[in-house]
Amino acid sequence: MSVDVGSVPTRKAVSFPLYRTFSRFVRDPLRELERISAEAGGELIRLDLGASRPYLATHPDHVQQVLRRESQNFVRDGMFWRPLRGLFGASIMSEFDEWELSKRILQPVFSTKHVRALTESMADAINAAVDTLEAPAHAGEAIEILPEMGRIVHETVIKVLFGNKIRQAEADRLVPGMEKLATSIAYRFLLPFVPRSIPLPGDRAFAAALEMMDETLYELVDRYRDAPGEGFDIFTALCQARMTEGSGLDDQWVRDNLLSMWATSIETTTVALTWIWPILDRHPEVAGRLRKEIDEVVGGERVRPEHLHRLPYVKQVIQELLRLYPVGWIFPRIAQNPTSVGGVPIKAGDTVLVSPYLTHRLESVWEDPLRFDPERFSPERARTHHRYAYYPFGGGPHMCIGRHVFNFEAELILTSILSRFRPEVRHAEGAIPKIGATIRPRNELKMTLVPLRSAA
């Protein structure tokens, strides 16, 4: 299907009256959106929910216009941001001056240069976290994938987030709290037009988890105020900025940004690494090639940062993983001024949604899009992709600043586990996606790790 990507407002969006199939949409919104996206074939879509009629842009040219070319017109605002604004406040997850200030303060912590300086300590943390998998592996015990990936990610990123300024008991409270926030916000995220006065499933659990998270984070801020310290971690950068940037920054601002970075640094990586194991289980040829590359480069050693540049297939596997299961599955924007997208007039105040998950599965953009094929990201083929055919970290000024940490961490964790074990996933065929703040497997997933070498 040819798609008009011009800017002359002469067309109408493809309309889908979701209010007619609302119960089906609520039961499985991801499947409904996939169906709609496939039928539209890249045309701009109007989702008619009755109370709300947002547009949905999936064609790479339309996405590029919204996220990059007209990023100053399409802003983070409107009802689709209400659940996140209530959670993250005036942080890097916001817009305008609040976002610019937070980004300016946090950007140095996530620079490529600084991330490289952290690689040795992160590799040590990953190897130590993977060490604890040896006991259940040699005992033949199954592990729950998502909690174990969360534990490994948490133990890796905690130094980047807090340096040495957090106690183990405090860190242990934050992990389940973030897990509960991520799962309980799902209905508010999907149904943002429902007033807060009308209770939805998850509201009570969300409030309890948020209260616990806030209590812990404010304790950390209070302690830093009483005994300031040095460091190049996120927490220190925020606390020092609060003291030097003026009276406009308070404890609430520090808390908002801490919670934002906690969610983006841990939740997204955990979920992505949860998906990789059922995918590899269903694609033994990919798993075999991965193991061969890792064995040739790493052998029986502990994984080090210098190994990664010699593991190109590991990088391709992570890239293809993010094509099928991007860390951010949808990005809402609202138009400040009239414009047009794909020839469709957009009024000021209209909401336009862009979805990496849906763009990454368009047949007009990707050949056989549901097939897991890391060769799509070989050097020869990767350069042929449209810039916005693949945008798992968003795009334009709001592209995720933590993407370098994610890539390094994900590649190291995958390599470390596969250098020691052969994972066997139980019921990998049951790994069905469910959307909320991120795209998680609907059902609990377990796997057994078969040791590649005998216990020492």
Regions found by a protein language model. Give the residues of each.
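Cytochrome P450 catalytic-domain helical core, especially the substrate-recognition surface
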Residues: S2-R35, E39, A51-R53, D61-Q64, ...
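Cytochrome P450 proximal C-terminal region
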Residues: V3, S37, I126, V130, ...
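Conserved cytochrome P450 catalytic core segment spanning the I/J/K helices
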Residues: T21, S111, A209-L273, A287, ...
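Conserved cytochrome P450 K-helix E-x-x-R motif and the immediately C-terminal K′/meander segment
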Residues: T21-G41, E215, E301-G342
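Cytochrome P450 catalytic-core helices
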Residues: T268-E293, H404-S419
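Conserved cytochrome P450 K-helix/beta-meander segment immediately N-terminal to the heme-binding cysteine loop
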Residues: V354-R381
